[in-house]
Regions:
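Flexible "arm" and connector segments at domain edges
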Residues: 1-126
Length: 126
């Protein structure tokens, strides 16, 4: 990749700790932990939203674990720049969709507007 990206974490202080962890435990082991932590966060979020459980401390704890796990993924695959670029693109797209939603009166109208925008963009590609 020749693109220049603005990194998510440039010289992030935890980088050395995370690299040591991968050197000691191995990348595959760490990726398994990341999957496990994502599952634990999912469980806590579902408890909160579906069962209305007051579990903010657990959500904070699992979010921190997932955040560390995502840093493991970024470092392990050396994808800091490309991930930063995709985050920017996805936030830009969300911002555009929010602008559309703010000008529509219903979810149905919003959905039609998004579909029309996609069709228009597809025509540009042809």
């Amino acid at each position: 990749m020749n693109k220049k990206y603005e990194p998510l974490h440039d010289d992030f202080p935890a980088t050395n700790v995370l690299k040591r962890s991968q050197a000691i435990f191995g990348r595959d082991y760490q990726m398994g932990i990341v999957v496990e932590e994502c599952s634990e966060l999912q469980k806590e979020l579902l408890k909160n939203t579906n069962r209305k459980k007051d579990n903010l401390p657990e959500i904070i704890d699992e979010t921190a674990d997932v955040y560390i796990g995502l840093l493991h993924v970024i470092i392990s695959y050396d994808i800091n720049g490309p991930v930063a670029q995709r985050v920017k693109e996805k936030l830009d797209r969300l911002n555009e969709r929010l602008k559309i939603r703010e000008t529509t009166s219903s979810v149905e109208e919003y959905t039609k507007a998004i579909e029309a925008k996609k069709a228009k963009e597809a025509q540009k590609v042809k």
